A protein has these predicted regions:
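Active-site and adjacent substrate-binding regions of carbohydrate-active enzymes
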Residues: 1-186
Length: 186
């Protein structure tokens, strides 16, 4: 048995093991020494889990592990770091991206990306897009992290439908949709 929250081919790392953490830090530092300018940490909110109590996201060791990683790696160089955190809320997101630099530069949160998902359906089977809710969520996050943290603005990634197809009309108004979305993000 081993814990895997995604594919059986993707076992979760045991972040409680100090030798594992050091191996991760050594790998990060190897890349920093070669001039990499930043890192994206996939599902970073899952590293501090408490499996005994079935806490998989935002567990008790999450932020201590990120701070330790940052002090051993990221703080050595002028980098941009972003953590993908599906479980982040505006109230907790500033911990990831606090301007004091103790953790990460910014956070990816996904509240705006799941507004049209339908409970019990596949992630590609979307409901009509709730544009007013979308604007309110964007505003809420921007205001909540203003001068406290850095919320990364994005509209798609490798796990989600492409932005023009998701938020626009890729058949009739592909170019117009792309321009509108680019203007909004900028």
């Amino acid at each position: 048995y081993y814990l895997h929250q995604f594919s059986v081919k993707q076992p979760d790392l045991n972040w409680e093991n100090p030798k594992l953490r050091q191996a991760v830090y050594d790998m990060i530092n190897w890349w920093i020494d070669r001039g990499v300018g930043g890192f994206r940490l996939d599902v970073i909110d899952l590293i501090g889990k408490d499996t005994d109590n079935c806490v998989m996201a935002e567990g008790p060791m999450l932020h201590p592990f990120i701070r330790e990683m940052s002090s051993h790696t990221f703080q050595r160089a002028d980098l941009v770091t972003v953590g993908e955190a599906w479980s982040a809320t505006p109230e907790r997101a500033f911990l990831y991206s606090n301007p004091d630099g103790s953790e990460l530069s910014m956070v990816f949160q996904f509240e705006h990306m799941v507004l049209d998902q339908q409970p019990g359906k596949e992630k590609w089977d979307l409901a009509p897009f709730p544009f007013v809710k979308f604007k309110k969520v964007f505003t809420k996050w921007q205001q909540a992290l203003y001068q406290k943290g850095w919320n990364s603005l994005f509209l798609d990634n490798h796990d989600l439908p492409r932005a023009v197809s998701h938020f626009g009309n890729d058949e009739k108004y592909r170019v117009e949709s792309a321009k509108m979305l680019a203007t909004m993000i900028h």
